[in-house]
Amino acid sequence: MKSHLHGAAPLLALAACLAAAPASAHAEDADSTIIVTAPLQTDAAKARAAQTPGGTDVVSYEDYADKSVVSLRDTLAFSPGVYLQPRYGQEVRISIRGSGLSRGFHMRGLTLLQDGVPINLADDNGDFQELEPIFFDHLEVYRGANALRFGSGTLGGAINGVTPTGRSAKGVYLRAEAGSFDMLRALVSAGVAGDRVDAWGAISADTSDGDRDHAKRRSFRFQGNVGLDLSDNISTRFYASFNNINQQLPGALTRAQALTTPKMANAASAAGDQQRDIDSLRLQNRTRIDLGAATLELGGFVNAKSLFHPIFQVIDQKSTDVGGFARLDYAAGPVELTLGGEVRNGKAKAKQFVNIAGRRGALTFDADQKAQTASLYGEMRVRPVERLSLIAGGVYADGWRERRVNFSASPAGDGRIGFDAFSPKFGLLFEPSDRVQIFANYSRSAEFPGFGEVFQTIGTPPVSSLVSDIRPQRAWTAEIGTRGTAGIAHWDVAFYRSTLKGEMLQFTTNASIPAATFNADRTLHQGIEAGLDLDVAPWLRLRQTYAYSDFRFRNDAQFGDNRLPVVPRHMYRAELRVGTDALHVAPSLEWVPQGPFADYANRVRTPGYALLGVTGGMTVADGFDAFVDVRNITGKKAIGDISAVLAANAASAIYYPVERRAISAGVRARF
């Protein structure tokens, strides 16, 4: 795997300055804490989420502090309605309400944000590996149309990772851990604040051989921000992030291999030294202007990214995305109004080479790709009576994708295609008491195809060309639910039903080539998203989530009413935390009673499974903690994820095994 650490020298210098600056100032502070941040940002996020008439969740750093945080799965496992299954390393399948259901690589159907600014590329695809959850103060999950405040009109909604500031995370914080498969991880962060200026920065490094052959990973990351109070009414914050991620790809296995020898790698993946290596640098700004009854936020970003991705060929892309956004929030009496817009414009130099054991061979393809996605959104909230809010809003989005082929060893064509859609939303929020809410909404979503869907290699002989009849995926979703607290119980339950037209579905053509995409006619996604926490005593807490997912075709000409593959109908997770912050242990369970289908023909279903784990932590000294994370205690062999095919058979290499037994332990400290 290649290394680019030499480009990180300026970032190391900046982080060192940040680490040194607060040390002496913090020595005068008698209070010490082990958590990364103060809860102020998280509390504010929870207050905003509580005003949303639909499924939302805020996950604080404390909720996953004892875990070995490798991917988003480690942070959002107990967020209701979020389906996450690890494949290897930081690669996970992430889906909400069946979003991007058959996309087994990169990501589709969700808007990913960091500090409120999308990290999705201009064609709306993205790499979730660029979100490093170990840096975050908290994560905000807005499911479905409830993500309107972020300008998202996708089926799945939005996930926003929020980093600390110098005011919420003063001092120096250290975290280090080691574990199975030669895993080593470390984090150092520092924050400092003055009267009108604050700064925060962090560096993380990670290395592991992986729990499968040919699954080594290496990463080096930096995050930082500087905030300025320009006046009593105007503040601005500048953000910078750098990612150097090197990940070998072990590939998918046959059913028999996944259930008997899950450690092995796919033969083609190993022979081709398949990898996904990402270098990215992101700069962004957010400026806030207080106008009295209204608040205006505006800003922009630039993201430079390099992708080196040997698979069936070596994909070598260099892209630059720029964008801007603005949002106005107004509140006066019983009326609240949000108006906003954003635009993302990107260009990429996309090349492909013959894969010679993971190295570039002869050039086979060279194209210039351009894309733009823009949206305007608005939402009005009216309280006709004290405990009832009525909400109406909508998102208008348009975009285009364009490709110009400079060279191709096989037939390939230029092309350009555009899309637009309006997605309205209507909802209500009723609060029968101060601690109970009942909500309902009805909304439309629209998802535009990305480059992988717009330009496909099809036919015999294969031709890479514009698929002019590819359509946006559209859906109407009805949702009703409740959240609240009563006695020892805190609950969050939502029922949803989405009727889709043109769902973008994919099927694997072979083990190394990314899937082909087609628009289904009519499909149905319906289910239950439930979370129930029981605070039995100060030293005893039970966390539970349950998801019921019924995804199927509707009178399809080829597949009838078959179930859609990949996501199981039932999934239950539970964690029982016993003890206090001084000493605690938390056994956990992930249970899938019956696995999902692996194909659209519904010929093959994977077996169910139950995975047991445990985490624990203790306070060693003031400001110094130790923690341990044990996964898959029994060494269960099971299938965790699938790359869907039209009709599976015994030779289909489409299965990813669950994580093997692993143990890690670490320490964290604040000075």
Region roles according to the model:
Residues V385-L390, D398-G399, Y496-T499, F518-Y600, ...:
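Gram-negative outer-membrane beta-barrel transporters
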Residues L110, V117-R143:
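Short acidic/polar hinge/loop motifs at secondary-structure boundaries
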Residues D31-K67, V92-R93, L110:
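N-terminal periplasmic "start-of-domain" segments of outer-membrane beta-barrel proteins
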Residues G171, A178-T207, R212-P250, Q274-L291, ...:
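Transmembrane beta-barrel wall of Gram-negative outer-membrane proteins
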Residues V197, L296-F308, E431, Q437-S443, ...:
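Membrane-embedded beta-barrel scaffold of Gram-negative outer-membrane proteins
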